[in-house]
């Protein structure tokens, strides 16, 4: 005699429909997790790139401000003023602070770096105490020893300061002056300052951009006898 037992319903397993529903749910969960991961990764990458751009621009700005601040320094300035003259070779025509270039994107200046009181001839073998910064082809450039002391110097004759990973889109120098009397006859002092505005972007992502501004007070006032 055959005995037929009813199969336990709990041992039947999942139906095809139930498996498909479970699979869809798993796919949706994994897709959500993947989307969150990608969003976090993009945010992290953007933060790193923004920080990189900021560091590059800050370094470039600090280099310019610390250098421009010294413009016109002359070791013998006290002696010149005591004789009511201004024979400062670092404030003469052609060596004094000068802003030029396209849209005032270039600055030239000199200072007595070695404090020997004289401005040397242009030389490629030693610091000739002539300095400059400008925007050229998306990069900040500085004038090296022996190069043309001109805002229109060939691009290859000056050196790039900024890294190729960033592109400068704007650089402007604005000179501001104020003349005050000294109370000694007709002599006066001219105070000078330079306002710098610089904008840059990531070369690989032009949507990431930043603008820095700085006010630089030139420490060496110009004596007008």
Identify the residue ranges that each predicted region occupies.
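Aliphatic-rich helix starts adjacent to a transmembrane/signal segment
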Residues: 2, 12-75
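Short linear sequence signals and composition-biased patches located at protein termini or domain-edge surfaces
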Residues: 3-5, 150-225
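Short, glycine/small-hydrophobic-rich surface segments
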Residues: 45, 68-109
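Type IV pilin-like appendage domain
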Residues: 89-181
């Amino acid at each position: 005699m055959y005995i037929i037992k009813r199969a336990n319903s709990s041992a039947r397993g999942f139906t095809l429909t139930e498996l498909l529903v479970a699979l869809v749910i798993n796919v949706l969960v994994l897709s959500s997790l993947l989307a969150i991961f990608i969003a976090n990764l993009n945010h992290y990458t953007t933060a790193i790139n923004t920080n990189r751009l900021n560091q590059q621009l800050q370094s470039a700005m600090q280099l310019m401000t610390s250098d421009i601040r010294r413009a016109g320094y002359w070791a013998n300035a006290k002696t010149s003023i005591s004789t009511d003259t201004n024979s400062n070779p670092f404030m003469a025509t052609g060596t004094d602070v000068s802003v030029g270039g396209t849209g005032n994107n270039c600055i030239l200046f000199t200072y007595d770096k070695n404090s020997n009181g004289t401005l040397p001839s242009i030389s490629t073998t030693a610091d000739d105490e002539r300095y400059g910064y400008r925007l050229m082809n998306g990069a900040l450039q500085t004038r090296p020893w022996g190069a043309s002391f001109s805002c229109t110097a060939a691009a290859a004759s000056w050196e790039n300061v900024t890294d190729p990973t960033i592109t400068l889109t704007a650089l402007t120098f604005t000179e501001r002056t104020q003349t005050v009397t000294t109370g000694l006859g007709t002599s006066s002092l001219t105070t000078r300052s330079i306002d710098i505005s610089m904008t840059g972007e990531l070369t690989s992502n032009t949507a990431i951009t930043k603008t820095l501004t700085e006010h630089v007070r030139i420490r060496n006032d110009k004596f007008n006898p």
